[in-house]
Design a protein with these regions (language model features):
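Short, conserved beta-strand element in jelly-roll/cupin
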Residues: 40-44, 53-70, 106
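Ligand-binding loop in jelly-roll beta-barrel domains
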Residues: 32, 68, 77-80, 88-114
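Hydrophobic ligand-binding cavity/cleft-lining segments
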Residues: 1-15
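Double-stranded beta-helix
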Residues: 99-148
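Short acidic-glycine-tyrosine-enriched beta hairpin
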Residues: 7-10, 31, 61, 73-91
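A short glycine-rich, His/Asp/Glu-containing loop-to-beta-strand
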Residues: 14-51
Length: 148
């Protein structure tokens, strides 16, 4: 099926999802684009996903604040208008710096992030997660947590 043109404005955004303390607004799912996905992600200081990897490429563009990205165990602080590209299989995480921040995210072909974000938002309550349950949920969506 061929994708159709569409426009998404702030007035038509779907409600934000709470994904482990990060607010995720889905702008385009792979169903809409027939391939890639686009989200806005924001959070307060210290918020961000634990180290993980997945089977799709992912790129982030820092819109606001400072964000510490860890890529294959090496950390770097990124400010506004910085692009971070992560090929499939790259172990990565990020944490928003002082004052919080906001990211624009695009996944590559085969991305399953928006479905995973929706499930985490619905099935994982706020607070410290049940790690075995979270690990299983993520694995069902092509994401592997890198614990320890």
């Amino acid at each position: 099926m061929k994708s159709q043109a569409f426009v998404v404005s702030p007035k038509t955004y779907e409600p934000a999802l709470n994904v482990l303390g990060v607010s995720v607004t889905v702008l385009a799912s792979n169903i809409q684009t027939q391939g890639y996905e686009i989200t806005l992600q924001s959070g307060g200081e210290g918020a961000g996903p634990p180290p993980h990897r997945h089977v799709w490429d992912e790129s982030f563009f820092v819109l606001r604040g400072k964000v510490e990205f860890s890529i294959d165990g090496k950390a770097g602080l990124c400010g506004p208008v910085t692009l971070v590209h992560l090929p499939a299989g790259t172990v990565h995480s990020y944490r928003f710096g002082a004052g919080g921040g906001e990211l624009f995210e695009i996944t590559g072909q085969g991305g399953n992030a928006t479905r995973m974000f929706d499930r985490v938002s619905r099935e994982v309550p706020p607070g410290p997660p049940d790690v075995p349950a979270l690990t299983s949920l993520l694995q069902q969506n092509g994401v592997t947590l890198m614990l320890g």
